[in-house]
Structures are given as structure tokens and as C-alpha cells.
Regions:
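Conserved beta-propeller blade repeats
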Residues: 398-409, 453-467, 511-526, 561-577, ...
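Beta-propeller blade signature
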Residues: 364-369, 433-442, 487-500, 540-551, ...
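Loop/turn-rich, solvent-exposed surfaces of beta-rich toroidal or solenoidal domains
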Residues: 573-664
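Beta-propeller domains
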Residues: 343-395, 422-431, 441
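Aromatic- and Gly/Pro-enriched helix-to-coil junctions and flexible linker segments
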Residues: 38-73, 245-257, 289-294, 298-301, ...
């Protein structure tokens, strides 16, 4: 490609009067942006306009000067050698406060510590601890202060243990100050320790003595720490030799420290690229860096330079870095497909961003040619295109709004979504919804593939020839939606269709939203799923995968965080990295759009519910909603729609102001170069416009497509479990599982949140108990499965009560044979079974129906008759708890339900933040500690309570109710009829 390694435009240094540093920087940025904005529309292909945009971006990077900790590439210098513990520890007391870490022990170190030697025993006044705040600060919330009077002490005395309250650093001016002024503590060695496993890192530590409380005794004193890791670094004596990651923030525009950091990053980038490209291509550029470095020495020796000189040297360093970056052989394409699109209006929410009526008109489908040259050219691919087929035949796609472009593996065909964006808010009609279109890569043959009152978007070419996409066709509504603003919020999930738009089938029967399907290197379909069956609304919207025909949906990462703040809140736009087992995604917010910070995901390490499988690619931007809370989300929606080129290199869109995003090349070492920006509208979804290897086409194993039905006889769907005891949790001692209970989760069919209130837990699902199937003595099960229904399983003990329950769900398709190893089996351990499972030696079991009142679920039919037979009369006579079945005031429930459910029943709450709700929260079920086994009501169902003896069927009904979240309603409509005990079937199942 001719543009690779081409020198970017070298502007003439501007001559202007000298002004103050801050004012000059602001003036330079404003002038450059004004130059770009004043250019005529056709001039955006000219070198001057692109130069102005690139320079404006460089100035913005200098203004922000975010140099976060990141993996340091091995450089061809002595600096790449092993770092000693005392060398890294020196950064904890060097006086530099950057908001980032000053030292960093090994990741996940057991009981890590850092210490400083004051040189002599000193009566302490206070210790001031500045936390790093470019990563979750809560990791040090249990920090301890320990002391010793002599170096080499065999033991340390703990003189302070923090209470768990999160503290911060210099950026927030909220360090932890430990007061020893009246404690009588004397120490020579001051050690900070975090008990347990921790990736221990702090910004800075200061120690003050009682003799002179104004003097920081720890400053530049010898320090040490327990271990070093990949983020540890040698503290250099001068700024020239310091790695970029240790440079403090600039206090003036275009500081020499920042220029040297750019030079150092250029060297490291050249060293990386030298392994995959001809070194002679990089030699002149490295020589340029050396020459610049010498001139910087001269400036430093002369005591500095005026801002215009520093700016010129900074631009020179950036040009060299940009040239080195464009020598990257992974940038071996000369066209980039992308769309232009305004951020949607209305509610900032992950769901509402993809409703067509909220789209802002403008944008289109574009191609950026020669993106790595001085004069990239932008072409509107649909400028003269007219729809040839579909409702909009004969019309151009304007104004409207575009979304989610997709390129075929051979590079010849493009799919995208488009909405006219007309109508009211909200409105679901052909004119208001997104529909999928197809066009050739040269802009010809524009046809409409989908239409109707459904949102259809996020198309994805499947290797077998079909197209996966996201659609609202299944029906149902968001369970926590319809309140702010009061819009209906339809659910959208995975579908597929033939290449011509025919033969549309449902791939996912999930009851809440899914997004952004793509095909990974193994031919599997990956996508983001919001999964909150009986769980907090805000903890699980991460990557899932399934076969291209929808079979076997699995969460292989991130679905069960220990706490919400410990990892990305949400992961959007997932894509497989070429030649790798890793994936890239955007760490985004629940209460935001699909932008944020970029992460790489590796499923091979075991998931610790936090960051074990996650690497930050852009740590300059915190993880939205995880870090900074809800108020900071809009300002953190900076990066988005990453397209991986390798584990190191990516295309994406970015804007530091989270407003007008341009197309960038970035790498995971902090380099970022602007390729294109439109001053009027954001860019989205850059894709190299070229062929790429097709993943394997996995065979269909269901009979739902027209082609499959024609070739394969219809067969019942089945589910097999090899060994229910094979799990990554501890079963209660002596438990014997005899059956599986199968429960259907019903999609919400009424738009407003908690209308109706299904039960004591907020925002929970209506459900139906389909029945039970036997489990063999070896823990295996094999049974017929209902097609097209979202179901989950409970493992029942010998007495018929649930021991364990899923807090997720699955489904099967026509003809599918779903197999599970166990009950939440360990993903990183192979099964140990030697003999065939007993259940597979027989025919599949039919589902044994549940008692009346369980399907559909109905408290008045399932539970109230038991109370009427055994409890109501006695309670009424003794003026005890009212267990009458008459109507109560709240939610249309009966008196008995209102008095029993919340206090004596058991339920999981589903509201935002309920992960922290104790027994009603959490992310996973603790075996033997939920449902009937954990309810207070269980203590009143035997002879201990006034000699009560319930027949097995009646006690089973009560246990079933308790195991099923102690719900009241089983459908979302006709609540008065349900309260009267009438059978009300769900409208959508």
C-alpha cells in the first residue's frame, strides 16, 4: 500500500505574538479547529484540512496528557531488563502525584506490602496515603499500616487497619490520612499491607514525624515491596530515560517531558513493528527520533524554550510517531467502510439508543480511501443509489439515520440498518423503525431486506449464507422500562433470515435485550445479552455465544460478577481478534450508549468475577458506571465500535469529549492516531473494506429453517445432563438430587415497570412451572424439552424441595439436542466420567406436570387452598396473622399473600442495586440456602406449629411457591381475574 510509512504533512510553524502558555495553547487549538471548519465541503480531501484536524487532535492529546499505566513493550535498551522490587517501590515516595500508580506489585499478590525506610526511628505524626484512581480504588479499602524500629525486622506491628471505606488520591484531594499524633507510635520502617489477594498499587505515600509535622520524611527515601509484575518499572534518574508511563502530568502546554514521552513511545512502537516488517523501513524514522532527542537535550541545557518552539518540537515528535505507526503491516488496506450518524436523542440508555423513532436525521454509508495518506478521500457510497426492491423502492435513503454496517467475508456486499425516523415518540411502524438493507461494495444494487413494525438492525453475515440480526419481532417489553420517559420499551433478540430477507426465524427466545452479533474465529455467533433472571438489573450484560442456528446459548465470560463495580458494567460490540483466542469489546454503561472504554477479553483464565479475563486497552477512559458512577457516564462515552486487526492494533471511533467521534487507529500501548473526522457529525463502525478469511460454516442441527425442514424429518427436542453434581460450587453434605424442576420464564407483556407487581420482589418475571423430570442415581438426566420457551432448572432433593436454582435461562429449537455437563460445571476442567450416563441408556423422560396453580403460576390457586384447609380458621379464631384469601389493598394481592410473602417467604429482588440486598440479592444461588429451605415459613409447616400435619401434596405446594420466588401472579394481564383464582393464560410465551 503506497500510503504506508508516508510522511504526514509538515506544516509551516505559525508565526504569532508570544502569549501566556495556557492562552497560547487554547488559541492554537481554536485556530486549528477554525481552519478545519472553514474549509469548504470538498476541501476535506485536501492536505491542509486533514493536517488541521490531525494537529487539533494532537493538541487535544497534549491538553489531556493522560499517560495511564499499561503493559510496557520490551524496548531495545537496557531499560527493558528485570526490575528489582526496590526500583519499582521508589515510585511510591518520589513526590510525583499523577493520579496513576507510583508502584505496582504483582497482580493478585497474596498479602502484598510496600514499605519505606525513614533512616532512623521517628515518632510518627501521620501517614498520608494517596490511592491510584485510574483503576478501581476499592482494592485497598482494607489497607493496614505496620511499623518496625529496625530494618530487616522479623515481624511488624499492625498499628492501623482501615475500615473498608474507599479513599482516593491527588486528583480528588481525598487521600487517607492516618493520625498517629496521639498514639505514641515510633517507627523507622513504615509498611503498608493489604491482607488477602490484591494487585497492590498506590499513587504516593507521605510520612510525617511529630518533631516537624511539615516535613515529608518518606520523600525519596529507600523503599521496597513484596513483588514486581508486568506493570512494575525502573525509576529513571532523568526525564529523558524515563518510560512514558512514568512521566508526570505537564504543567504547561507541549512540555519537554511530554515530548520525550512521545519520542519514547515512538521508539517502543518501532521496536514492536520491527518484528513484523522490514527494519530498513523504520531506520530513517528512528534516526529522526534520535536527532530530535539531541535537540531536546539542547533545549533542556539552555533552560527551556518558548511555547512556539516546544509546540514545533511536539508536532515533529508526533509526525515521526505517526509515520512509524503507518509502517504497520497490519494496516494493509486502502479503504475503510463506515457510517456517519448523530447520537440518538431521548433517553440515555443501552436499550433506547436503538429505537428508530429516537434517531436524529443525517449521516449515511461512506468509504474512506487512502486513510493513511496525507489526502484521504471520503465517498458517499449511496449518493446516487436508489432502492431497487422493497417498500422504499424508487427512493433514496435520505434524510433518515444509518446504523450497524456489515461487510461480507469476500468484501463484495454490505448490509446496514436504516430508519426514516419519522413519526411520534414512541412509535413502532414501518416509517419509524430500523430496517435492514443490502448493497454492493460499489454502491449498486440497493435493496430492502426487512420491513414492518419491528426494529431490525445489527445484521451479521453467517458463514453458511444466512444473515443474523437483532429484532423486536419476538415481542415483550423491558421489565424495568416505560418510566423515564414513559415510553414502551420492546425487547429485541437474535433472529436470522435467508440472504434475500426471506425465511425469518427466531434464534433467541430470551426475554430481555441482546445486541451486536458477530462471528468468531470458530464459526460461533457471539453477542451481548442482558441476563437478569432473578438478579440485579445492572450486573450482567456481557458476551454470550451460540451456534449460528441459535443452539446452545452459553455465557462464557462475565455473567456472574462478584460486585458490579469490580469489572465492566456492560460489554458491547464484541468481536473476535484475528489469529487469537481473545475478543475486543466496548466497556459501556447500562444508562448510556454503546461507547466507553475498550477492553480485551480472554476466556482462558478462570473468571474471578472481576478483571481476571479483562485487559484494559484504553485505560485513559474509566469503565463507565463501574468507575465514576452514573453522573459521569456521558463524559466517558469516548471510544466505540472497535474493529480488531491484531491483539495489539485496532480501528475504532473516539472523541475525548464524547461528542463528535472520528475514526482512529489505536494500539494497546497508548498510541492513537486520527484517520478521519467530520466536523459536523460522528463516525461509527470503521471496517477495512477488503476480503477477510471466512470462519468455518458449522452445520445446522435444528429443523427450523426452510432448508433444514426440507432435508430433515421433524424430531423432538431433548436436553441431557451428564452429572448434575458436577458444579463449581459446594453441594450441601449428604444431599441427593432426585429430580429437575423445569420452570418457564414468561416475557413481560405490559410496558410499565412493575405493573403488575408480580410478587414481593421488584421487577421479577412471571413464570410457569412446566413440571419435573427424574435424575438417575449417577446424577444424569435425559428428557423431552419444550421448544421456543425460555426455561431454567432447579435441582430437587428427595423431599421435593429445591436445593439449587439457575439464575439464568436457556431454550431449545425444533430438533435440537442440548447437552449440559452438570449444574454450573467448571469451564476450565474436563469431565471425569468414564461410564455412559444412565439416563442416556433409556428414552428421554416426558415432563411430569406440576400441580394445579403452577402452570400458569397462581398463588390463589396453588397456595390459598392449602391455607384455607389448614390455617385460616385457626388463625381467625386466635386473632393471629390474617391468612384470608380476600383482596388486600396493595397490587391487587390477597391478604394472606401480603402478610406472608415478604416476611415469611423467600424471593430474589431484581431492582437496580439488589446484588447488595443480602439474601434477596447476590449474583448466584447458594445451594441449600434459598427458596423453601431458606424461608421462615418452613418452620410453621410441621408439628412444631400447634401440631400441624400437612399432607405431602399440600406441603409440596407451599414448597413449590417458596422455591419459585414466592410470586403472586403468573401472567401480566387480567390481574383481577387472577386474584379471584381464575386461570389466566399468558399472552406471550
Amino acid at each position: 500500500m503506497q500510503a504506508l510509512c508516508k510522511r504526514p504533512p509538515h506544516p509551516r510553524p505559525p508565526g504569532r505574538p508570544r502569549v501566556s502558555s495556557a492562552r497560547a495553547s487554547a488559541f492554537a487549538l481554536a485556530a486549528i479547529w477554525a481552519f478545519a471548519a472553514d474549509a469548504s465541503p470538498g476541501a476535506e480531501t485536501a492536505a491542509g484540512s486533514m493536517t488541521a484536524l490531525v494537529q487539533a487532535d494532537w493538541i487535544e492529546q497534549d491538553r489531556r496528557l493522560v499517560l495511564p499505566p499499561r503493559p510496557i513493550e520490551p524496548a531495545p535498551t537496557a531499560a527493558a531488563g528485570t526490575v528489582a522490587t526496590h526500583e519499582d517501590a521508589a515510585g511510591g515516595c518520589d513526590g510525583r502525584k499523577t493520579g496513576r500508580f507510583g508502584f505496582h506489585t504483582a497482580s493478585g499478590e497474596q498479602d502484598p506490602w510496600w514499605q519505606v525506610d525513614l533512616g532512623r526511628p521517628v515518632p510518627l505524626d501521620r501517614v498520608v496515603i494517596y490511592n491510584r484512581t485510574d483503576a478501581p480504588p476499592e482494592r485497598t479499602a482494607r489497607i493496614q499500616v505496620q511499623v518496625a524500629r529496625e530494618p530487616g525486622a522479623a515481624s511488624f506491628k499492625t498499628v492501623y487497619e482501615h475500615n473498608g471505606k474507599v479513599f482516593y488520591g491527588s486528583r480528588e484531594s481525598q487521600p487517607l490520612t492516618v493520625d498517629f499524633s496521639k498514639a505514641g507510635v515510633t517507627a523507622r520502617i513504615v509498611r503498608l499491607r493489604v491482607p488477602g489477594r490484591c494487585s497492590f498499587a498506590l499513587e504516593e505515600v507521605e510520612v510525617y514525624g511529630r518533631d516537624d509535622p511539615r516535613v515529608n520524611l518518606a520523600l525519596d527515601r529507600p523503599a521496597d515491596q513484596k513483588s514486581v509484575g508486568p506493570y512494575s518499572r525502573r525509576r529513571a534518574a532523568t526525564a529523558k530515560t524515563a518510560p512514558a508511563e512514568s512521566v508526570p502530568p505537564a504543567h504547561e502546554p507541549f512540555s519537554l517531558a511530554h515530548i520525550r514521552a512521545v519520542v519514547e513511545r515512538g521508539r517502543r512502537l518501532a521496536h514492536r513493528l520491527g518484528k513484523i516488517t522490514a527494519p530498513q523501513r523504520l531506520a530513517p524514522l528512528l534516526a529522526g527520533l534520535d536527532d530530535l532527542d539531541e535537540r531536546l537535550d539542547g533545549i533542556e541545557a539552555a533552560g527551556g524554550a518558548a511555547e512556539p518552539v516546544r509546540r514545533d518540537r511536539y508536532f515533529e515528535a508526533r509526525r515521526l510517531l505517526r509515520q512509524i505507526a503507518f509502517c504497520n503491516p497490519r494496516l494493509d488496506f486502502d479503504r475503510i467502510l463506515f457510517i456517519k450518524r448523530h447520537d440518538p436523542g431521548g433517553l440515555y440508555h443501552m436499550v433506547h439508543q436503538y429505537y428508530g423513532f429516537g434517531a436524529v436525521a443525517g449521516g449515511g454509508l461512506f468509504v474512506l480511501s487512502d486513510p493513511f495518506s496525507d489526502e484521504p478521500e471520503v465517498t458517499n457510497l449511496l449518493e446516487t443509489a436508489v432502492v431497487e426492491q422493497g417498500r422504499l423502492a424508487g427512493r433514496r435513503l435520505e434524510p433518515g439515520s444509518f446504523l450497524s454496517p456489515e461487510l461480507s467475508f469476500d468484501g463484495r456486499t454490505i448490509l446496514f440498518a436504516y430508519t426514516q425516523g419519522e413519526g411520534e415518540r414512541p412509535e413502532w411502524s414501518p416509517r419509524a423503525c430500523y430496517h435492514i438493507f443490502r448493497v454492493a461494495a460499489d454502491g449498486t444494487g440497493l435493496v430492502q431486506l426487512t420491513d414492518g413494525p419491528w426494529e431490525d438492525f445489527d445484521p451479521c453475515f453467517l458463514p453458511g449464507g444466512r444473515i443474523a440480526f437483532i429484532s423486536t419481532r419476538r415481542g415483550g417489553y423491558l421489565r424495568c422500562g416505560g418510566s423515564a420517559p414513559p415510553w414502551d420499551s420492546p425487547t429485541y433478540t437474535l433472529y436470522s433470515m435467508a440472504g434475500d430477507g426471506s425465511d425469518v426465524i427466531c434464534l433467541s427466545y430470551h426475554e430481555t435485550q441482546e445486541w451486536h452479533p458477530s462471528v468468531d474465529n470458530n464459526g460461533m455467533l457471539i453477542y451481548t445479552r442482558w441476563d437478569y433472571v432473578d438478579r440485579d438489573t445492572n450486573i450482567a450484560h456481557h458476551i454470550w455465544n451460540c451456534y449460528p442456528d441459535g443452539r446452545d446459548p452459553r455465557s462464557f465470560h462475565g455473567n456472574y460478577p462478584v460486585k458490579r463495580e469490580s469489572r465492566p458494567w456492560m460489554e458491547m460490540s464484541p468481536r473476535a481478534i484475528p489469529g487469537s483466542n481473545k475478543y475486543v469489546a466496548t466497556a459501556a454503561a447500562h444508562h448510556g450508549h454503546a461507547f466507553g472504554s475498550l477492553v480485551a477479553i480472554d476466556y482462558r483464565p478462570e473468571d474471578d468475577g472481576a478483571m481476571a479475563q479483562v485487559e484494559r486497552l484504553t485505560p485513559d477512559v474509566p469503565l463507565p458506571e463501574s468507575e465514576g458512577g452514573k453522573a459521569a457516564i456521558r463524559g466517558l462515552m469516548a471510544y466505540g465500535t472497535p474493529w480488531p486487526l491484531s491483539e495489539d492494533d485496532y480501528l475504532c471511533v473516539y472523541d475525548g469529549r464524547a461528542a463528535n467521534r472520528g475514526i482512529y487507529w489505536i494500539d494497546r500501548f497508548g498510541n492513537r492516531e486520527l484517520l478521519y473526522r467530520d466536523r459536523e457529525i460522528s463516525c461509527l463502525s470503521p471496517i477495512p473494506l477488503r476480503p477477510r478469511p471466512a470462519p468455518p460454516a458449522l452445520p445446522e442441527r435444528t429443523t427450523q429453517t426452510a432448508a433444514a425442514r426440507a432435508e430433515t424429518p421433524a424430531a423432538a427436542a431433548t436436553i441431557a445432563v451428564m452429572n448434575v453434581y458436577d458444579g463449581d460450587f459446594q453441594w450441601p453434605e449428604g444431599v441427593k438430587i432426585t429430580a429437575l424442576r423445569i420452570i418457564q420464564v414468561l416475557p413481560k407483556t405490559t410496558p410499565p415497570v412493575d405493573l403488575p407487581r408480580i410478587g414481593a420482589g421488584t421487577e421479577t418475571n412471571a413464570r410457569a412451572v412446566l413440571g419435573t423430570v427424574p435424575v438417575e442415581a449417577d446424577g444424569s438426566a435425559f428428557f423431552e424439552a419444550p421448544v421456543g420457551k425460555l426455561i431454567y432448572f432447579q435441582a430437587l432433593g428427595e423431599e421435593g424441595m429445591a436445593v439449587q436454582s439457575m439464575r439464568s435461562a436457556t431454550y431449545v429449537h425444533p430438533g435440537e439436542r442440548l447437552t449440559c455437563q452438570g449444574c454450573h460445571e467448571p469451564k476450565h476442567r474436563p469431565p471425569s466420567r468414564q461410564e455412559p450416563p444412565l439416563a442416556l441408556l433409556r428414552e428421554p423422560s416426558p415432563i411430569r406436570p406440576a400441580p394445579d396453580g403452577a402452570n400458569p403460576f397462581s398463588y390463589p390457586r396453588l397456595v390459598q387452598p392449602v391455607l384455607d384447609r389448614h390455617c385460616v380458621e385457626c388463625h381467625r379464631a386466635k386473632n393471629a396473622l390474617d391468612l384470608d384469601g380476600s383482596l388486600a389493598a396493595a397490587h391487587g394481592w390477597t391478604r394472606s399473600y401480603q402478610n406472608l410473602a415478604a416476611k415469611y417467604g423467600f424471593y430474589f429482588s431484581v431492582s437496580n442495586g439488589s446484588i447488595n440486598a443480602g439474601a434477596h440479592g447476590g449474583g448466584r444461588t447458594t445451594a441449600g440456602r434459598f427458596g423453601a429451605r431458606a424461608s421462615k415459613l418452613l418452620n410453621y409447616l410441621d408439628r412444631r406449629h400447634y401440631g400441624v400435619e400437612l399432607p405431602a401434596e399440600d406441603s409440596g405446594r407451599i414448597a413449590l411457591w417458596l422455591d419459585c420466588n414466592s410470586e403472586f401472579y403468573g401472567s401480566y394481564h387480567d390481574t383481577e381475574r387472577q386474584t379471584r383464582g381464575e386461570v389466566v393464560l399468558p399472552r406471550l410465551d
